[in-house]
Amino acid sequence: MAIRQLPEMLINQIAAGEVVERPASVVKELVENALDAGATRVDIELEEGGVRLIRIRDNGGGIAPDELPLAVSRHATSKIASLDDLETVATLGFRGEALPSIASVSRFTLTSRRHDAEHGSALEIDGGRLGEVVPRAHAPGTTVEVRELFFNVPARRKFLRAERTELGHIEEWLRSLALARPDVELRVSHNGKPSRRYKPGDLYSDARLGETLGEDFARQALRVDHSGAGLRLHGWVAQPHYSRASTDQQYLYVNGRSVRDRSVAHAVKMAYGDVLFHGRQPAYVLFLELDPARVDVNVHPAKHEVRFREARLIHDFVYRTLQDALAHTRAGATPNSIGSDGAGYTGATAGEMGNIASGGPANHGNAPGRSGSAYSYANWTPSQTPLGLRVDEARAAYSALYAPPPRNAPQSTGMPSMAGTGLPATSEDSGVPPLGYAIAQLHGIYILAENAEGLIVVDMHAAHERIVYERLKNAHDSIGLHAQPLLVPMTLAVGEREADTAEREADTLATLGFEITRAGPQSLHVRSIPALLANAEPEALLRDVLGDLREHGQSCRIASARDELLSTMACHGAVRANRRLTVPEMNALLRDMEATERSGQCNHGRPTWARFTLSDIDRWFLRGR
């Protein structure tokens, strides 16, 4: 078959296949153009989910009459002029493909007026056929009207979903935009009826956050704002008990652009680590700011993805920032105590605990089977399988934590004391500690405590398990990770890419306890392994580490395996169900919870405590009605 030059209309329709997937894609491209033009108000009118009509009206800078035909020409743009501009682009659009692509598959009208012009001008395009520029009355700004999307491409139109589905995609993208640009007023109408209005406000406005993601997220979100190495990460991360079954509340913006990035998503998941219940997803709204020259935005047709020039640095920065924010959450903090450093934790309410429980079974440390409650224990089996790990080195740290007290010391349960923590033992307002004072033990499982707000219920095994676990981790962090030399080096057959990674990352592997040299194109000599994990299938572990280093630039496999061992030890060392505690022992546990990082969840991600305010209890008994 002979090679031929494709006609311009067909070229535009091919480009439309990449840029215009559905009505939401059209709305995205047109609204981004409005924002790049400096608009502070954008009106979006839709009919039949955007298939019949999409009309975008803005108050931006407008387009001159003689530039209207150029605006709908391929690769015509006002945003870049050279390769240097492309490498440092800061606008949302830059390719000049959107308008001609949309115009080629719809009945398209572009009307615009510059602020210094006496009247506006309009240009109509019908399925790619260009009309004449004509004068038209119009307010300063631009209106783009897209009718009968895909009317001339029946195969594409056939794949569009139901009206409600297409409208849902548009609304989801507008939520994402509303979070990124709270300074812009957005008005949306569908089939002639107003459906949504986002009022302009401050970036950190609780009102904008609440109306986009819901009041629950706004109440449970931790503010994050950290800068370093020419990077800034700010926004909100939901507390661990506010988790989701899906990734529907994960928003990442790079220099104001909504994107998806596997490396950043991996860093976030790592940061949540052992505070997120199995199978649940974190919720967050994060803004990453950096020099535009350090990120390539020209890697995806719809600009949904970016490529970082220093991916490892970005991954580490995001991970450490969020890990620090989540580490400072402690049991007993009220919503008012949550600051920009992430310190503070509001605890799970009864409804939230039930929501977490619906994602999987819960472990209450030998608790008897129950039915008819939010949790079901009868058929529960531990989610952590026994590990073939060497525990001798961990025993020393474990024993040190639980050494018998001196003869003249008061008796305790072996729970670490709060002495020397430097943390306030009481709340500033009432003089009562955040978790209050113990008043009773329920069925040998729960501690009931009274604080200034009402009733606190604590799962004593889960809470003590977290306390022991954090103490064990801190003890091992102070010791460091030791390498165990092998009497006979182990030869490991790997792929060439894995061997290249091992050679390139030799220093990183050494910090993890592996001493590795290259034996051949597809083989490695392993001369030492992490001592604590000597019996944990080092070959499989090393392969996983190499895979992580190749894909993400770093690996948490060693730390995860170590933490899994310490978590198992903490679970076995924690106070068990049906253990009767005295009131002083229960109070000691409450004080330790207030002083321990991540004490809002046990090692498996379950909540350790819940709060029932006095007003909640009054409502149960219809008091005040």
UniProtKB/Swiss-Prot annotation:
One of its GO terms (cellular component) is mismatch repair complex. The keyword DNA damage applies. The keyword rRNA-binding does not apply. Residues 404-427 are annotated as: Disordered. GO terms for biological process: mismatch repair. Keywords: DNA damage, DNA repair. One of its GO terms (molecular function) is ATP-dependent DNA damage sensor activity. This protein is involved in the repair of mismatches in DNA. It is required for dam-dependent methyl-directed DNA mismatch repair. May act as a 'molecular matchmaker', a protein that promotes the formation of a stable complex between two or more DNA-binding proteins in an ATP-dependent manner without itself being part of a final effector complex. NCBIfam families: mutl (TIGR00585), PRK00095.1-2 (NF000949). Belongs to the DNA mismatch repair MutL/HexB family. HAMAP family: DNA_mis_repair. This is DNA mismatch repair protein MutL. The lineage of its organism: Bacteria, Pseudomonadati, Pseudomonadota, Gammaproteobacteria, Lysobacterales.
